[in-house]
Amino acid sequence: MPIIEQLGYLGLGVSDLEAWERFATHVLGLGVSRRADDGAFALRMDGHAHRFLVYPDPLDDLRFVGWQVADAAALDEASARLERAGTKVTRGTAEERADRAVRDLVKFTDPGGIPVELFHGPAMAKEPFRSDVVGSHFVADTMGLGHLVLSTRDRDACRDFYMEVFGFKLSDYIICDIGGYHVDVCFMHVNKRHHSLALGGPMPKRIHHFMLQVGAMDDVGLAYDRARDDGVVIENELGRHPNDRMFSFYAQTPSGFQFEFGWGGREIDDATWEPTTYHQISEWGHRRPPRRRPKT
């Protein structure tokens, strides 16, 4: 059984805080839960005090990933596993614990160069979350904020690291050629969500995309309309994946990496699950939108 329970939070470094706040609240439907003097802010979507930490930073990329474990004993065990695997582990400072609003955390860098934090005891919100634009709810809470797809220099080494050190379980692979690109992505899970982590090849940024799941199909369509109305660059139109069965679309965040907004994701029962390999990214849809040609 994985020692990690869920994808807890993402730390993002962004160059345009104002654009990110509008995007996160108006397009995605998240809520601002905290602001700092330097302009940084936190975003919530469920019972947790926050799921995203957004900092002023020209990086425009992922700064760190936070994975939740059950308690102090699990954090100590995870740290010991990392050290046995030859990975340097450092304890989070009091300032970092306060910023993340967690009881304790440790930090390390994974084989792909991604800064990772393990934590326990997240602060919970005092009031239920109600989105201003999402009519149903975000499928999060005990399944975590959603999923993320990371860039890796050595996909297999990263896959083995997460599976052997933390007990991540293999969901499946997608291997295919599309649009002149070779796609080879590994999907892994830590709870019943089909995947909380997917690993691809080298990409311009650390993160390819994060995914948020909602409780009603119409909320995906409404988010698609909001994104288009706000001038958000749509990367892939509405479609459905064959592996996790997610009905979704992809578009750009203000930082250039992507997000996926979906509904209907498959849940895994480890007692019966058999990993497989798919040879298409989508069963239907997820097409690149036509680009307007300049007038001559």
Predicted regions and their residues:
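Conserved active-site tyrosine of GNAT-family acetyltransferases
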Residues: 20-25, 82, 113, 158, ...
